Amino acid sequence: MLRLLPLTLAEVQRFQSTKEPPDLAQCLLTGFYPRIHDKGLNPSQALADYFATYVERDLRQIAAVHDLQRFERFVRLCAGRTGQLLNLNSLGNDAGVSHVTARAWIDLLQTSYIVHLLPPWFTNTGKRLVKAPKLYFYDVGLACWLLGLRTPEQVARDPLWGSLFENFIIMEAMKDRLNAGESAQMYFYRNAEGNEVDLLLPVGTKMHAIEIKAGATVNPDYFKGLKTFAAHHPLTLTSGGVIFGGAQSQNRSDWPVHSWLALRNKP
């Protein structure tokens, strides 16, 4: 099945008239839907129109969602859980719907390419360290809009800043794999002690591990999850590194640190 995903950061750069590096918060706020960049639209208004069309027209046609106001609240609650483990009971309770309805609505959001559920990685024995997937949006700009964020300053100050950056990088990785004709299957890692790697990309029978950090300066804690995964699964790890919110990539002794701006140069 053909997936028409939002643009990549590299594709968005083709619409820019300046060679100046983009502002990270503005990138997250604007998102990557082609029409916004092609026509130079105001992202807040364009995303409002997009969501209204999706809810009011498309949902009436493709699904029996009768309580549109409650469904909209449900989607906004999903945005508030960006980057978190999916808990349908909690999500349903907060939205005022049953677990069954919450599951049906999540499935609907998946099939209409609004949200993506990133599964946990499991060993060859089938043992999962956690069972729940993590929730992300196909377009981080839509997540920002659903959260009520309307300016880059609001995005940069929001408590979900790190999760929104993580969402952005994970979707860039998915688009990169699909554009290269590879499987979109990706995972995250979390062990019983809570050590986590944000993204595992299959490379043959092994994994490339990526830790994602929104901070503009490198912190030694950024490497904790990578070190844990390497220690526990040395035969699985083929390579790894950190993608962070700083402007300059760095070569560290154990793990390379890549600036998010390097994604502009992807083919």
Kindly give the residue locations of the regions a language model identified:
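Short beta-strand/turn micro-motifs composed of small residues
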Residues: R190, K213, I243-F244
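Catalytic core segments in nucleotide and nucleic-acid processing enzymes
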Residues: F223-H232, I243-G246
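Short beta-strand-loop-alpha-helix junction that forms the active-site gateway
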Residues: I212-P220
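Arginine/glycine-rich "motif VI" loop of SF2 helicases in the C-terminal RecA-like domain
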Residues: L178-N179, T228-T236
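A short helix-turn-beta junction within AAA+ P-loop NTPase domains corresponding to the substrate/partner-engaging
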Residues: M1-A10
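Amphipathic alpha-helical "lid/sensor" segments that cap RecA-like P-loop NTPase cores
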Residues: S17-T53, Q61
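Domain-level recognition of nuclease-like catalytic cores that cleave nucleotide substrates
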Residues: G245-P267
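Accessory nucleic acid-recognition modules appended to NTPase machines
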Residues: L41-M207
